[in-house]
């Protein structure tokens, strides 16, 4: 029984014996693709030659590599100082081979402990102990970790500092001490610093002939830092805007997230290792910093302390120490905000000033690889380490083969409304297919303003309605204060006149917006919000653009499609899933949307905040059952294929997602189909990743929408592809990564079992990027994923950590979150 359980848990994972003294087994990266996957490369579309931000890479090969755990006798040393000590040890003890160090683990190409497991070295009365952990070969997971550590060490040696997870110019850099025209960039304006750096990652790739290869990803990265401390920017009225923001503490270059802000005195005390210290004492003794303001805001940040586990003493899981959540109190004058607030993001002048650094074009990005190579070659500090390792980096971007998928015809009113050379279309060509005999009424709610200021906007709305030939009118106009907005919305609900009704609400701020949307979710009254700024805009062109989008959103919420795309395939339900993590709370909102029509334009929506795996499975089961029941009510059959697009999952979470989401979902769906006496459907589960560093270029410019790459830069153990679906007018277009975790395959009437082909999957995915009814063009991800994201974000921001209300059944099948 135990052997079978072990075999089941290790199914799909390749295991190899590792060398070295301990003779243990090493788990290699699992094969995260559907069973019996044979064909992963498509062939439809025009073949194009592309460039990427990957390049070829090599180091001197060794028979084996060794990993050590390090212990330093002196506490509190920074990784940079530890690295310098290890460099001295290597020289003074004449240790063989090359090495790199990540702050805890030491990787070497030769043995430093001379046959024993543990050895101790001494430099300037500082003792360093090495304990052998493992030995490994090249082209293993440990090897890739080691090379990534080597590249990080090179950046430290060349003067970079670790800030968060990346390596950048130091936080105290200024324009006078930054080398120009080579290496990391630096920019300063409006109390903001943009600290430059390089992101580097080694990963597996596949050559055109199918052989494995090693590729190096290189890209310039930036960190935006506000020169004003939290002490300067803080006031009691803006606490909500600061909660959830990231801060940097310059004394140790660490980043934290603000969980809470509390006014305290720097002479207040706390316990630390048997001593009672004031905050002023602590920062003076530890960092030689004199705090200047006695009473000031303190940033409270929650961090997880990982318990140190001694595997030699632990015999079962109950004996293992538990991780703990700790709260750190940091004085506001030492905390500097990272990134932008919502107000700063909407500051056009500020974003324009920083755009030259943050939104670089494709031709500038193509220079990243040669710039990084030149920086290493011309930096004297890096030569010793790079020469020892035999480091070779090709200074030209990797050329790869891609394809441009055929154009999709966007249909509205029976006619194609998009041009074949473009990926967007105009509002004037849109014709809604409105149900005859149904009247529509739009009641207006104006918050904290005089109704006469909105006359021009309402006239624009009426004009757009006439252009679209809707049987609709603007009804009552209600004016109220922010505190009475729910009462006015109740008046709109009670004034039922046999019409399909929606409330057009002009909101002055996010607080009122949250009230309106909370009312929508709980009562089922459709609402369309417009900001006060847009509703009172005196610029005719800008106001008319907003009014046309507003009308399109209103009638999309009524359940009408402004356009469609013909997707010919067997009866299919497409599901979008995403998770919203509230920065100021531990609660997460899991949203899922299920297509309930053949054109994949209308969706049934669910939002849950499950606690634990069992509750997640229960809510997932209930959501699938309700959506499949609705699908059957409409079409009299259940779908023969279910395609799930799942966002919000990183590479490190793929194994967990496959085990606890995919493998749990399959029996849930099977049970529902068996209860209905139907054949189990084909289930396809695709992970969608937007936040990736990969860039694709076509002849020095952005890749065209519809560009697919499914070879060379894809991982050999994944069934994945990259798709550029959106055109950008400024900066560089980013592809989206799609990774197929599961395909249960389909059994046709002849009994033949078929997997989805790469061509079909890529075509469906690209087509679904055309169906977002808040933008007359393509978007970066398939529309169900984007709708799930919009829904999760709306619920998360409205409820801010509290348990979300159930979505009212009146709007569950409507796009109320547009």
From Swiss-Prot:
Keywords for this protein: RNA-mediated gene silencing
Signal peptide: none
PROSITE patterns the UniProt entry points to: PAZ, PIWI
Domain PAZ stretches: 220-339
Alphabetized SMART domains for the sequence: PAZ, Piwi
Alphabetical list of Pfam families matching this protein: PAZ, Piwi
Domain of life: Eukaryota
Gene3D superfamilies noted in UniProt: 3.40.50.2300, paz domain (2.170.260.10), Ribonuclease H-like superfamily/Ribonuclease H (3.30.420.10)
GO BP term, pick one: regulatory ncRNA-mediated gene silencing
Residues in Piwi domain copies: 501-800
Any one Gene Ontology molecular-function term assigned to this protein's record: RNA binding
Record-stated family: Belongs to the argonaute family. Piwi subfamily.
Name by which UniProt lists this protein: Piwi-like protein
């Amino acid at each position: 029984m135990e052997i079978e359980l072990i075999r089941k848990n290790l199914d799909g994972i390749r295991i190899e014996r590792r060398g070295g003294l301990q003779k243990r087994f090493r788990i290699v990266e699992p094969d995260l693709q559907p069973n019996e996957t044979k064909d992963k490369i498509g062939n439809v579309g025009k073949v194009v030659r592309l460039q990427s931000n990957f390049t070829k890479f090599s180091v001197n090969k060794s028979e084996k590599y060794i990993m050590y755990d390090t212990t330093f006798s002196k506490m509190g040393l920074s990784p940079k100082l530890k690295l310098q000590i290890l460099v001295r040890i290597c020289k003074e003890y004449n240790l063989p081979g090359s090495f790199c160090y990540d702050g805890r683990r030491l990787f070497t190409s030769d043995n430093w402990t001379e046959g024993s497991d543990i050895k101790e070295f001494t430099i300037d009365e500082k003792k360093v102990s090495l304990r052998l952990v493992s030995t490994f070969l090249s082209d293993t997971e440990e090897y890739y970790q080691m090379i990534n550590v080597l590249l990080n060490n090179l950046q430290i040696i060349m003067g970079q500092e670790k800030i968060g997870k990346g390596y950048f110019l130091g936080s105290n850099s200024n324009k006078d001490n930054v080398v120009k025209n080579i290496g990391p960039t630096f920019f300063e304006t409006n109390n903001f610093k943009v600290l430059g750096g390089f992101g580097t990652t080694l990963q597996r790739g596949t050559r055109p002939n199918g052989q494995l290869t090693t590729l190096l990803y290189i890209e310039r990265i930036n960190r935006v830092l506000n020169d004003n401390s939290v002490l300067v920017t803080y006031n009691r009225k803006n606490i909500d805007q600061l909660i959830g923001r990231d801060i940097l503490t310059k004394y140790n270059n660490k980043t934290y997230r603000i969980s809470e802000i509390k006014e305290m005195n720097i002479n207040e005390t706390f316990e630390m290792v048997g001593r009672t210290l004031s905050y002023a004492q602590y920062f003076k003794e530890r960092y030689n910093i004199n705090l200047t303001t006695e009473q000031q805001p303190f940033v409270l940040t929650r961090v997880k302390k990982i318990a140190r586990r001694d595997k030699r003493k632990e015999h079962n899981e109950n004996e293992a120490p538990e991780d703990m959540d700790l709260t750190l109190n940091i004085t506001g004058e030492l905390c500097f905000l990272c990134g932008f607030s919502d107000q700063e993001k909407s500051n056009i002048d500020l974003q324009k000033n920083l755009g030259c650094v943050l939104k670089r074009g494709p031709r500038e990005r193509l220079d990243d690889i040669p710039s990084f190579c030149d920086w290493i070659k011309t930096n004297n500090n890096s030569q010793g380490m790079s020469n020892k390792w035999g480091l070779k980096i090709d200074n030209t971007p990797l050329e790869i083969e891609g394809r441009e998928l055929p154009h999709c015809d966007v249909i509205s009113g029976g006619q194609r409304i998009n041009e074949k050379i473009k990926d967007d279309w105009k509002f004037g060509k849109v014709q809604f297919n409105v149900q005859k005999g149904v009247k529509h009424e739009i009641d207006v709610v104006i918050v904290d303003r005089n109704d006469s200021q909105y006359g021009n906007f309402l006239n624009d709305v009426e004009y757009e309605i006439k252009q679209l030939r809707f049987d609709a009118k603007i009804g009552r106009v209600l004016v109220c204060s922010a505190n009475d907005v729910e009462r006015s919305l109740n008046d709109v609900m009670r004034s039922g006149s046999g019409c399909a009704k929606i409330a057009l609400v002009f909101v002055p701020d996010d607080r009122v917006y949250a009230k309106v949307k909370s009312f929508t979710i709980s009562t089922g009254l459709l609402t369309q919000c417009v900001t006060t700024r847009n509703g009172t805009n005196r610029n005719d062109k800008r106001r008319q653009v907003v009014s046309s989008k507003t009308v399109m959103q209103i009638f999309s919420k009524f359940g009408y499609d402004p356009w469609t795309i013909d997707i010919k395939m067997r009866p299919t339900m497409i599901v979008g899933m995403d998770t919203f993590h509230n920065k100021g709370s531990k609660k997460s909102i899991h949203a899922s949307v299920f297509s309930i029509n053949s054109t994949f334009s209308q969706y049934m929506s669910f939002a849950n905040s499950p606690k634990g795996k069992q509750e997640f499975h229960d809510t997932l089961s209930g959501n699938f059952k309700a959506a499949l029941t609705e699908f059957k009510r409409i079409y009299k059959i259940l779908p023969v294929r279910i395609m799930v697009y799942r966002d919000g999952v990183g590479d490190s979470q793929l194994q967990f997602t496959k085990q606890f989401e995919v493998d749990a979902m399959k029996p849930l769906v099977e049970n529902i189909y068996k209860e209905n006496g139907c054949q189990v459907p084909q289930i396809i589960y695709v992970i969608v990743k937007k936040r990736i560093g990969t860039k694709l270029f076509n002849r020095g410019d952005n890749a065209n929408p519809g560009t697919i790459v499914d070879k060379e830069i894809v991982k050999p153990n994944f069934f994945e592809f990259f798709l550029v679906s959106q055109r950008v007018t400024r900066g560089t277009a980013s592809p989206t990564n799609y990774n197929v975790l599961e395909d249960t395959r389909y059994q046709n009437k002849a009994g033949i079992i078929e997997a989805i082909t790469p061509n079909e999957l890529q075509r469906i995915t690209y087509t679904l990027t055309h169906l977002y009814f808040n933008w007359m063009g393509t978007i970066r991800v398939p529309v169900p994923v984007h709708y799930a994201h919009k829904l999760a974000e709306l619920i998360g921001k409205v409820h801010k950590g509290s348990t979300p209300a159930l979505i009212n059944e009146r709007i569950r099948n409507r796009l109320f979150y547009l």
